[in-house]
């Protein structure tokens, strides 16, 4: 393996001589200069990326520090201003220095309770200003139902208001006939709510219930109910009231049937409901 000798040129700089020797050594030992240059460029790019990351991180941290300092300054300024507001004024302005001062409105509030009562007696406006709770109580009393009831007559100058009705007094007892009539009316109203009626005879309840249609002049379903009465079967047909039915108020209490006939040895009574 033959090695080439590198001549030193005194006219060239030291860096150029080193580069020449490095290229000669790489060629002597079989290294590819293109690969070396590629690796060198990659190293430079990595260093550039790291520099950019460091700069961005430092910039973010500096922004955070700057914001924190500004926030601390705002807090200090706010606390100092609130403390200044809490401190009472040691040297109040005189009446001549105030822009809207006058002898009528420049009233000094007394410190003793006797003077306060005197002010309240002379001017109720000042007392109301000193005690706002009394004004709230007065407003609440004015809004109460009794006060409203009394105010209606006092405003219109109608004199003494009449007494309110008392619900504790006993009402006048109604006669027995009116009670029976109202009870009968209630019974009829209750019967209107039912479609099926139960016919009772000698404590025997109707047992069979079925739906059939009889008599063409009735346009609704008829409910068939059978019961024993004096060893004879009595059939009661309960009919849903329609516009074509005969309006008979007495039929609501099953006193007068609308129709009677005999069918297969059974007595049939038709009552609308």
Swiss-Prot record:
GO terms for cellular component: cytoplasm; mitotic spindle; nucleus; site of double-strand break. Keywords: Cytoplasm, Cytoskeleton, Nucleus, Phosphoprotein. The modification Phosphoserine is found at residue 123. The lineage of its organism: Eukaryota, Fungi, Dikarya, Ascomycota, Taphrinomycotina. Residues 12-24, 55-64, 92-124 have a biased composition (Polar residues). It comes from the Eukaryota. Residues 1-32, 50-124 are annotated as: Disordered. This is Uncharacterized protein C651.12c.
């Amino acid at each position: 393996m033959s090695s080439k000798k590198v001549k030193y040129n005194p006219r060239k700089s030291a860096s150029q001589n080193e580069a020449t020797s490095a290229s000669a050594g790489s060629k002597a030992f079989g290294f590819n200069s293109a690969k070396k240059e590629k690796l060198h460029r990659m190293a430079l790019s990595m260093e550039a990326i790291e520099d950019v990351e460091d700069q961005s991180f430092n910039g973010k941290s500096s922004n955070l520090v700057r914001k924190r300092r500004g926030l601390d300054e705002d807090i200090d300024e706010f606390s100092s201003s609130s403390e200044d507001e809490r401190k009472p004024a040691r040297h109040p302005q005189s009446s001549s220095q105030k822009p809207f001062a006058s002898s009528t409105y420049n009233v000094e509030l007394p410190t003793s309770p006797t003077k306060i009562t005197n002010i309240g007696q002379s001017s109720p406006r000042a007392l109301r200003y000193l005690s706002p709770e009394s004004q709230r109580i007065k407003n609440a009393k004015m809004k109460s139902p009794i006060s409203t009831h009394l105010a209606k007559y006092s405003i219109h100058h109608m004199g003494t208001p009449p007494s309110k009705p008392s619900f504790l007094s006993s009402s006048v007892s109604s006669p027995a006939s009116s009670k029976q009539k109202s009870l009968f009316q209630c019974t009829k109203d209750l019967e209107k709510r039912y479609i099926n009626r139960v016919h009772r005879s000698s404590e025997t309840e109707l047992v069979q219930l079925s739906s059939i249609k009889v008599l063409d002049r009735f346009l609704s379903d008829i409910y068939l109910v059978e019961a024993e009465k004096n060893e004879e079967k009595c059939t009661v047909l309960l009919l849903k009231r329609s516009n074509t039915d005969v309006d008979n108020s007495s039929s609501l209490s099953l006193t007068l049937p609308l129709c009677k006939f005999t069918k297969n040895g059974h007595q049939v009574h038709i009552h609308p409901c």
